[in-house]
Amino acid sequence: MESLRIYNTLARDKQVFVPRQSGEVRMYVCGITVYDYCHVGHARMLVVFDLVQRWLRAIGYRVTYVRNITDIDDKIIRRALENGETIKSLTDRFIGAMHEDEAALGIQRPDIEPRATQFIPQMLGMIEKLETNGYAYQAADGDVNYSVRKFANYGKLSGKSLDDLRAGERVAANDAKEDPLDFVLWKRAKADDPQGASWASKYGMGRPGWHIECSAMGCTLLGEHFDIHGGGQDLQFPHHENEIAQSEGATGQTFVNYWMHNGFVQVDNEKMSKSLGNFFTIREVLERYDAEVMRFFIVRTHYRSPLNYSDVHLDDARASLTRLYTALKDVQPDALALDWNEPHAQRFAAAMNDDINTPVAVATLFELAGEVNRTCDASLARQLKQLAGLLGLLGREPRAFLQQATGAAQAGGLAADEIEAKIAARVAAKQAKDYAEADRIRAELLDAGIALEDKPGGSTEWRRV
């Protein structure tokens, strides 16, 4: 099998992946700020790095996968005040909702899922190191800031130079800062902050800045120098750039070897975002589409490419996934183990080892499905199911998927017992040689999104289309 190659944002190129410790991978991914339901952009990040960790394990690595939860933030505080509830009540509720969405999408839970509020002492410890090393200062307003110009390599991840940067990207300009580009490490508490929004420190009561949270959790849980750091493309700057400055400023060593970023989700060629009002929650999508359809919709696009969200694309994903399940409907896979020397498995592995190239990997699944349809070969069916399983797909009994109510069927389509009743009426019409009535019932069902397949022996199977 070829070596895994990953596009490293830091190098701006694909590189052969070489872990710091042979056979082991330590990976950190920036998770979700839990003040609302997860949207499709979150779903993409969750699925993408679920695929990465699944593949790393599939090719034999022992993986420690950390994905954090931001459970203290200005947005969280505002939402809790608006709702008249405590910060913990709000964050616990949306963490629970996130876990439900993850389970629906077939996302395996990370090995460690730290909450920012569990690591306040470690964050303060890192801030004190930065102060000792000359990178941090307490401003007149009580905030502790990072002195960006003190870090010689600032901009190495994003490719931005200090002269080209402007204040205001995710961090508002502040007259108390020594430089407008400086960012906050510790926010001084405000008089009207609610309970649970601040902690005692040598700098006074306050709470951590967003960037220091991930630096402290990553270094504490994975070590000061680890293999992979991932997140959405929008986090490349300033969040990940600031993580590097903080971590390397505190420890004096390289923070992360490989940086991976997934692309945006777009609607009509614009980034999906709350500010533009063009976003959809995972739950809104799952009211209309099966969760595996949504996962397949994400999987079949390369993780670094834009993902264009539309009903047309989701409908196409549903039709494509239906084709894969249909290939397995009448063929029982054999029980042999996956053999990576099999040609389809080799092509699949080559694709996944080429920067997690899921479009090519999915194309291999369709090649297999076509051969299963032609040959009804049990070993090919097994390969299809096994390889798809590495992508978190085709895990259900085929007929169960094909007969489920999704999309329009959920919004008032025929229930299973109604379909069976119409099939029985069609059988009766055929037995009475009333073939016109039998054809009428078939056409009526097709209009309702139900396709019939007459099997040898006189039975009839159905599926939703």
UniProtKB/Swiss-Prot annotation:
Q: Which keywords are on file for this protein?
A: Aminoacyl-tRNA synthetase, ATP-binding, Cytoplasm, Ligase, Metal-binding, Nucleotide-binding, Protein biosynthesis, Zinc
Q: Motif 'KMSKS' region, which positions?
A: 271-275
According to UniProt, the name of this protein is Cysteine--tRNA ligase
Which Gene Ontology molecular-function terms are recorded? ATP binding; cysteine-tRNA ligase activity; zinc ion binding
UniProt-annotated binding residues for ATP: K274
Q: How is the cofactor bound?
A: Binds 1 zinc ion per subunit.
The compartments listed are: Cytoplasm
Matching SMART domains: DALR_2 (SM00840)
Q: Which organism is it from?
A: Burkholderia ambifaria (strain MC40-6)
* Cleaved signal peptide residues: none
Recorded GO CC terms: cytosol
Fetch the CDD domains from UniProt. Anticodon_Ia_Cys, CysRS_core
